[in-house]
């Protein structure tokens, strides 16, 4: 697990939604950064997809940048391909970048384990929260609220520490390429 206060690992990833490459440093005036490791096919992500789109789009109005990142092996999971990412983002209404981590190195650098998995960084790109979106799970009947991430974001924007413990994310394992699973996985 990436320790709190860790400086955000650098990345440069293609945005599936437009012909561009995106980095954290493209947004130097952001008040916070949300990284959401997601994919298209996982039922845990599908459950929160529309709410996450609203969350990320609303956060933009507060100068909070959200990045959705897909790190799955698209050879074995073609529903997660960049072409399908474009369709998914348009259907959900993402107004934020949906990035493709083909090498899976970004997921490894953040120690992401599942989809969805959330990392919130303050304006200095220091990790303030890592964990779940909320308590909703496929089949558990709990409403999707984004409460855990929203409370963490509210604390960061107020200049406060996010209270611990942070509830770990639960979802589908990142689909690592053959022989590419990190040491922390499994």
Predicted regions: what they are:
Residues 168-180:
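A short, charged, Gly/Pro-tolerant segment at domain boundaries
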């Amino acid at each position: 697990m990436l320790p709190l206060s860790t400086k955000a690992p650098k990345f440069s990833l293609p945005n599936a939604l437009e012909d561009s490459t995106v980095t954290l440093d493209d947004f130097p005036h952001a008040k916070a950064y949300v990284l959401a490791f997601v994919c298209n096919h996982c039922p845990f992500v599908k459950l929160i997809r529309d709410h996450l789109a609203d969350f990320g789009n609303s956060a933009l109005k507060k100068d909070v940048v959200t990045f959705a990142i897909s790190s799955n092996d698209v050879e074995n999971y073609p529903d997660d391909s960049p072409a399908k990412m474009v369709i998914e983002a348009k259907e959900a209404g993402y107004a934020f970048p949906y990035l493709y981590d083909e090498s899976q190195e970004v997921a490894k650098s953040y120690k992401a384990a599942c989809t969805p998995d959330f990392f919130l960084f303050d304006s200095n790109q220091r990790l303030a929260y890592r964990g779940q979106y909320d308590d909703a799970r496929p089949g558990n009947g709990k409403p999707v609220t984004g409460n855990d991430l929203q409370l963490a974001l509210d604390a960061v924007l107020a200049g406060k520490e996010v209270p611990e413990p942070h509830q770990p994310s639960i979802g589908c394992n990142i689909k690592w390429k053959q022989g590419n699973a990190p040491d922390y996985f499994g």
